[in-house]
Amino acid sequence: MLGEIESNMKKTFRIKCYKLDLGVSLCFLIYLLVSLIIPPLIGTHEKSDTQAEVSITTSERVCLIDNNEDALLWRLRLIRSAQEEIILSTFDFRADSSGTDVIAALWGAAERGVQVRLIIDGINAQLHLSGSDEFQALAAHDNVEVKFYNPIRLTQLWTVNYRCHDKYLIIDRSTYLMGGRNTSDLFLGSGGTSRQNIDRDIVVYNGGFTTASANTLLEYFDRIWLLDTNRAFNAAAENHRVKKATAILASRWTENNDSKRF
């Protein structure tokens, strides 16, 4: 008799656990579906902000960059030329060969007193960049600020597709590079991967003077930089791995800086 009662109690307990698991799974599924189908609730702007007709004559000069090797060299040269400020926004930044060249160049600029601000799409940064010791060493520098745009948050899954595909580099608030290339071997350099994307960049400059288009880009960057959806990236406290990575960046930058390619 007692055995039968105990058996029934266990059976009842298993049924309750099953119902609880089913209920939790169903609630999560409903939450996920709602997150994917509800319309955006933030970021409403007037259409006139993006559809205004503009007619301006300027003295700006434009250089077209079609070659991936040139695309890397232009980035490194521009970063090396910076005297006051560097702004970099990108969708995908990886610490591969070309990416580490850029990280080393940014570190070298920060070392000579240039203020560096980076904003990187949150998903790709979390997946491919935040665990890099070299990137940690860069982000730990006193002259460097890093933000991740809209990183994944389980409490706001409906924002998971709100991505930042901007790709531009601004030097001293005057010269800038803009295009379709991310910061990785897939888009930059020539020897880091067996296949590469074909893309294009432009460099816009005006003899060191701030241009109308540069001002527009800076205003846009400031708006994106201050969004509440961004999260500051806090680098790991200085440890032996960061110190080792810093030495690697210093060596990489010295090697690239002495190269005849630049």
Locations of regions flagged by a protein language model:
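Short, internal strand/loop/helix patches
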Residues: 147
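Short loop/turn segments at beta-alpha junctions that line or gate ligand-sensing/allosteric surfaces
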Residues: 151
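Charged, low-complexity intrinsically disordered terminal segments
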Residues: 2-144, 154-166, 171-262
